[in-house]
Amino acid sequence: MPDFRLAFRPFREQMAFFERKVNVPSTRWDDIRLGDHAHGFMVAGAIRAALLDDFRNAVLRAQREGRGLAEFTREFESIVAKHGWTGWTGEGSAKGRAWRAKVIYQTNIRQSYNAGRYAQLTRPAMLAVRPWWEYRHGERGYSRNPRPIHQSWHG
């Protein structure tokens, strides 16, 4: 797996996007619909404010300091133990816990990176010199299971 610390170095627009998000307690991943995910920070099943704050701060530190998944996973385990968080998908096994930490880490870092890049690419000065985009899917090898629709947009 690629080392995301090399690919996702934080930049101003990325951090601004993540820092604007507000904590949103949720019981399931689909409690929040469509574009609302862009404005709220949520972890499915995390309904207590202190738990959500700790997860958010862990993601924020991971972005600011370039922490990798292994470091984030250790912090995830510590947060879960500290709050006695139970009843979440993946809880019952080491593989499940690793999966859940990875989902939280990668989703938030990728989303903020993409939103930050979009902010950069849609500046009027940038659009004046690059008025169109070309979709290139998976050239860096991050997507091991690409969606057919994404592959169809390539090029």
Describe the predicted segments one by one.
Residues 1-155:
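Domain-core detector
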